[in-house]
Amino acid sequence: MKDVVIVGALRTPIGCFRGALAGHSAVELGSLVVKALIERTGVPAYAVDEVILGQVLTAGAGQNPARQSAIKGGLPNSVSAITINDVCGSGLKALHLATQAIQCGEADIVIAGGQENMSRAPHVLTDSRTGAQLGNSQLVDSLVHDGLWDAFNDYHIGVTAENLAREYGISRQLQDAYALSSQQKARAAIDAGRFKDEIVPVMTQSNGQTLVVDTDEQPRTDASAEGLARLNPSFDSLGSVTAGNASSINDGAAAVMMMSEAKARALNLPVLARIRAFASVGVDPALMGIAPVYATRRCLERVGWQLAEVDLIEANEAFAAQALSVGKMLEWDERRVNVNGGAIALGHPIGASGCRILVSLVHEMVKRNARKGLATLCIGGGQGVALTIERDE
């Protein structure tokens, strides 16, 4: 099979819920990244074979949002596109599908990633088609129902984090300390400009003025142990998961340009990283956050690596309880994990996050001249994904 490489990796800044990017649809955000990948790599738009983008919240978004992003991003009508929904893993699963297409010879160049605007997810009337003949109708929040609700246990996925905290003995103090560390690492990374190479600025309007958004909006400058300790539990009055030690609701997009190694050589493009292996697993939905343990083990087994060999890891922080449970099971070196902060600080635009962590991983590996990297996420509904990449020595 053909070797698959990444030659471009970009993302938008991550916007707060109803924040700086709220006025831009997921398609608009995704199209900016598609356009920037073409411009920065110099690959002719007509040479792209397919676009694969994850998006979870598609109610009201129009037909095939990935196709919309491709065309709006400057690709010709001849380039096909597909939108996928693997919840939080969508953006990473898109890379897996792209890898398979290239390995099988069905495509030479694919743009893969994810996009999401959680701020614009609509409320829906589920009985409007059949009609409510008498009485009131209830609006359903598609953001929660389609993105954050466990369909099997009929509760918010935050409850699954409480389940993990009890199962693995993760205290409130440990969760808050983890969350504060994520905030501190993210703020230090932003202050040092470590994300600048991966971010595509977004032009937006505010009070009649044009603003350039080029920095992640979510990280807190005022995060403190005392402030985190004052927050009430969000999902269980006697629990430990709070808004401060959980990931947030966000807007953003991320994508990579992938191609066969032979095509990269023919186009004289530098290789940022090689795709080595991918794995997906299923677990009990009530303990969905532990799935990265099994996805990571399967992925490492497929590539023939030991965890200790991996130089850098990006593991999506759905909740501090979840991240700590995974770390406890895998016994990985925390100094190699989410070195610039994770989703608790940076945010979690669900359809984009899988690719966002991969983009950040690639750029940090380049900066550190690291060789082996791992990206992994848990997925609402009881699944997990992992992907390994490698850079040449």
From Swiss-Prot:
NCBIfam families: AcCoA-C-Actrans
CDD domains: thiolase (cd00751)
Location(s) in or outside the cell: Cytoplasm
Entry keywords, A to Z: Acyltransferase, Cytoplasm, Transferase
GO molecular function: acetyl-CoA C-acetyltransferase activity; acetyl-CoA C-acyltransferase activity
Record field: transmembrane: none
A cellular component term, taken from the record's GO annotations: cytoplasm
EC number of the protein: 2.3.1.9
Protein's GO biological process: 1-butanol biosynthetic process
Catalytic reaction(s) noted: 2 acetyl-CoA = acetoacetyl-CoA + CoA
Main location: cytoplasm
Disulfide-bond pairs as recorded: none
Name under which the protein is recorded: Probable acetyl-CoA acetyltransferase
Source species of the chain: Escherichia coli (strain K12)
